[in-house]
Amino acid sequence: MSIVFDENLDLFRLETANTSYIIGLADHRTFVGHVYYGRRVRRQDLRYLLRTGEAPFVPSENERERCSFYDTFPSEYSGNGVGDYRESSIAVRTQAGQHAVMPTYVSYEITDQKPELPGLPSAFDRENTAQTLILHCRDEVLQLDVDLYYTVFEENDMITRSVRICNHSKEAVYLTKAYSACLDMDDDGYEMLTLHGSWGRERQMDRRPIGYGKTSVGSIRGESSHQEHPFMAWMKSSSTQTAGEVYAMHFIYSGNFIAQLEKSQFDSIRAVMGIHPADFSWKLESEEVFYTPEVALTFSAEGLGKMTRNFHDFYRQHLIRSKYRNQKRPILINNWEATYFDFNTEKLLDIAKLASQYGIEMLVMDDGWFGHRNDDSTSLGDWFVNEKKLPGGLNYLVDEVNKLGMKFGIWMEPEMISPDSELYKEHPDWAIAVKGRTGTLSRNQYVLDFSRKDVRDCIYEKIRAILSSANIEYVKWDMNRQLTDLGSLALPADRQGELSHRYVLGVYEMQERLTHDFPDLLLENCSGGGARFDPGMLYYSPQIWCSDDTDAIERLSIQEGTALIYPLSAMGAHVSDCPNHTVGRNTPFKTRGEVALAGTFGYELDITKIAKEEQEQIPQQTAMYHKYNDLVREGDYYRIASYRENHFYDCYMVVSKDKKEALVTFVTVHARPNYHSLKVRLQGLNPNLDYRLEGGMENECVYGGDLLMNAGMLVPSEQGDYRSYLYHFVAD
């Protein structure tokens, strides 16, 4: 049993293969407290860790210091306005304009299943191995039920958390904050790790000490964003990739979020994660229910690397639903950086004809095929084919591509509307806008109000018609701007604070319909590159475009930060042109291919115009993809070295689950003069197996796994920046 309640000790034990998460009930089963989370411990009395036997004591023993108790008690879900001055997990506004709320324990349930979250992405359990603890809590004054959900995925060392809130009073109440998880523990010299960025440099790792007060990252942009990521970890300062204790939370959501650590006056840490409370409110009428999105929580006693592999396995096994989850994805070529808006059927077929000869398996037609769109100023929302560009329409183009033995895919941006469009002329009220205020344009477009079912239905029918008109097997779903001017003509004044969350729910509903109606469709999400690369999107699409920056060297740090928590199979990665269109850098074609191999792998350039020697490498690269993709897609990822840290080289590897095969990628970013070969210690191998290095220059390139991990392998020192090397080891 993963979950056990000890009636005598009032302790809930949530156990995974390597961890224990202990919850305690205090003061005659009134308060739900956090006792312990970390390495798995034997079943014993841990109640002393709640410190209820020392001042200020529990309220039943010392009512005069109830406030002090609230302000120090390690709560599993903190109330608001009654004495705990740390960050609250929930806040309300009543009809009387008051804000106090304090859920206390009522009862519990343990169930052998993983409940779904209505309208939200969430982890699933197809093998029926997970268990769920539901702690029923209530604020008796407000008649507000607050149910805390904990699902234990034992083999993944993962716990998911979410909250169900139900209003049983006769009056409506407004939620002004509803976090998904709260975790209190003593500080132990922890540092905080988050991911920051911008367009073209997403998910850069940032590790820093935790000072007193609140340290947070978040987004109020209507999506998870380029700038911050809905993830945080905290660890001892001595923790590395291979050693040390690491705690991590990841939000399975695609909208506004906050991830925060707070160090208190007594050196305790409070970690919270959930929907960002800025501009948020949700009206709960009598007997209505609100579900918070889910948080994935893990602990590793073996450094960041084990944390990474916990997330990778968990998302592959329990979050990605697509039929492509365990399948090799087709090698695609996207025409965006090849042509931008300047294309027609002839140009696309020229690219496809050559691509088909080189082993590329799908042509993806990007932005510019619809309405009268020849630049970014027009036609979003007008989802009909521009037959001036594509004479004969999609049917002719797709048929011709299929005749070449290739699949066909298409780009769409369903959430957006151009002021210069037929749709906007017909329905200007469909854009998110504040009445009387001039809308804020971004990329010459507004955002459609996806909180409205009539808007979603109209757009969905347009998408469905396009996808049904030809043999389209892939969709790139883009979102090229963030939300501003938050206002909906369909929501009353006291529900305007619901817009951002309802918008995200609308996107989820659209993608749920799409994947249901077109179950064989390969969906790739995108948002101006990687602005909506989050677990919520991963639930609907098995891969997400990692960044619009396709430069191989820039991609090293982008893909490092992404692979910290996401499986390599989820990262959209392409070989692109040089000089690179974002940074102007020239890198070897070989390096571009080998860096893109640590992702979905594809091409984004006009292969009819590149040098002959580069064209000749494409069949080698497509063969490389087919040879190694099963290993890359399913194996365990190990970060060996980071160019971000050493400013010299980058190295990572993937090891098969049975440890009989490994692929090492090494990139020399900056060559150095007068150096010996570099010794690199590998990870994750079986120390008792011998490994043959495929393609080794010596006759007998066989090394023990223990030797490769402890003594290391040698990488030659050669002239030239941006050189890459692949080393394939197979158990002998």
Q: What do these predicted regions represent?
A:
Residues 5, 10-13, 21, 31-262, ...:
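Polysaccharide-binding surfaces and accessory modules of carbohydrate-active proteins
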Residues 18, 163, 287, 333, ...:
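Conserved, mostly hydrophobic/aromatic
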Residues 71-74, 79-109, 114-116, 243-256, ...:
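Glycine-rich, aromatic-flanked loop segments that form ligand/cofactor-binding clefts
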Residues 100-105, 282-301, 722-729:
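Short Pro-Gly-centered flexible turn/kink motifs
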Residues 232, 241, 644-686:
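Carbohydrate-binding surface patches
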Residues 324-461, 474:
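Aromatic-lined carbohydrate-binding/catalytic grooves of carbohydrate-active enzymes
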Residues 391-393, 425-427, 431-590, 600, ...:
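Active-site neighborhood of glycoside hydrolase catalytic domains
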Residues 670-732:
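C-terminal beta-sandwich/jelly-roll accessory domains of carbohydrate-active enzymes
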